[in-house]
């Protein structure tokens, strides 16, 4: 039976994640169709490999889409969120640095559309998030430490993913402590350690390729299709 491809709008198409999304989505033309690629500035070419490109200022004129995937900058976030609500389209966003007012706008939009915002779209990290919460619940009174390692160009510390894992530990009743390492070209490594008397548990996730984040975002977009309005976590979409 023929399946209608999921129509995607890629917001932040000129960035590293945007380029990965365009490349990986093109590997599945039977199920994914990029109907618009949006960049901050006017594109040098209007159509590249069959994908129409738009400047951010032209966003209101984008063709119909089912889900927008956003890896851009906070200043471009508001118009995209408004367009998704107006069109009744889902939103997958990994844009970092959004303000508290933008987070409130996300919460309000979840009453109208299905959406997911995450600092990390790795499916492995989504599972780790759940494991950390369960371990914290079961190991009351144990020390909880989170050590994150990344490449030398990463400026923020602790990483957004480390803070997300810390929030999972806190939901389970633990009080996490953080340590950060910047070295070489490490894509991303997160260790969550629970230490008791005479024993410890180490939960580790290692990313060796940045494509995992783009694949996770495409997975999230597929999973949002047909879902009721609401704010979802990546781990919710695995169930």
Curated annotation (Swiss-Prot):
The portions of this protein that span the membrane are none
Q: Where in the cell is it found?
A: Cytoplasm
Q: Where does NAD(+) bind?
A: 12-17, 94-96, 118-121
Keyword Cytoplasm listed? The answer is yes
Q: Is Amino-acid biosynthesis among the key words of this record?
A: yes
Please state the pathway this protein functions in, per its UniProt record. Amino-acid biosynthesis; L-lysine biosynthesis via DAP pathway; (S)-tetrahydrodipicolinate from L-aspartate: step 4/4
Q: Which Enzyme Commission numbers does its entry carry? A: 1.17.1.8
Supply the InterPro entries for this chain.
DapB_C, DapB_N, DapB_N_CS, DHDPR_bac, NAD(P)-bd_dom_sf
PROSITE patterns attached to this UniProt entry: DAPB (PS01298)
Which reaction is recorded as catalysed by this protein? (S)-2,3,4,5-tetrahydrodipicolinate + NAD(+) + H2O = (2S,4S)-4-hydroxy-2,3,4,5-tetrahydrodipicolinate + NADH + H(+); (S)-2,3,4,5-tetrahydrodipicolinate + NADP(+) + H2O = (2S,4S)-4-hydroxy-2,3,4,5-tetrahydrodipicolinate + NADPH + H(+)
Q: Please tell me where (S)-2,3,4,5-tetrahydrodipicolinate binds in this chain.
A: 151, 160-161
Q: What is its main location?
A: cytoplasm
The Gene Ontology terms for molecular function here are: 4-hydroxy-tetrahydrodipicolinate reductase; NAD binding; NADP binding; oxidoreductase activity, acting on CH or CH2 groups, NAD or NADP as acceptor
Q: Which key words are in the record? A: Amino-acid biosynthesis, Cytoplasm, Diaminopimelate biosynthesis, Lysine biosynthesis, NAD, NADP, Oxidoreductase
Q: What does this protein do?
A: Catalyzes the conversion of 4-hydroxy-tetrahydrodipicolinate (HTPA) to tetrahydrodipicolinate.
Q: Which HAMAP family match?
A: DapB
Q: Which family does it belong to?
A: Belongs to the DapB family.
Identify this protein by name.
Answer: 4-hydroxy-tetrahydrodipicolinate reductase
């Amino acid at each position: 039976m023929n399946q209608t491809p999921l129509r995607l709008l890629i917001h932040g198409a000129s960035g590293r994640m945007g380029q990965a999304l365009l490349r990986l989505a093109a590997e599945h033309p039977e199920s994914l169709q990029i109907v618009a690629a949006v960049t901050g500035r006017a594109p040098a070419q209007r159509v590249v490999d069959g994908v129409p490109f738009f400047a951010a200022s032209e966003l209101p004129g984008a063709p119909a889409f089912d889900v927008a995937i956003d890896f851009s900058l906070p200043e471009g976030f508001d118009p995209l969120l408004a367009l998704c609500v107006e069109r009744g389209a889902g939103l997958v966003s990994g844009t970092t640095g959004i303000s508290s007012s933008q987070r409130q706008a996300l919460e309000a939009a979840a009453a109208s559309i299905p959406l997911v915002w995450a600092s990390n779209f790795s499916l492995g990290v989504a599972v780790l998030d759940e494991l950390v919460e369960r371990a914290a619940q079961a190991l009351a009174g144990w020390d909880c430490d989170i050590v994150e390692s990344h490449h030398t160009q990463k400026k923020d510390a602790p990483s957004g993913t480390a803070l997300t894992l810390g929030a999972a530990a806190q939901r389970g009743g633990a009080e996490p402590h953080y340590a950060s390492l910047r070295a070489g070209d490490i894509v991303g490594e997160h260790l969550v350690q629970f230490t008791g008397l005479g024993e410890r548990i180490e939960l580790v996730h290692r990313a060796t390729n940045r494509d995992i984040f783009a694949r996770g975002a495409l997975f999230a977009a597929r999973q949002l299709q047909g879902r009721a309005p609401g704010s979802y976590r990546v781990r919710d979409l695995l169930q």
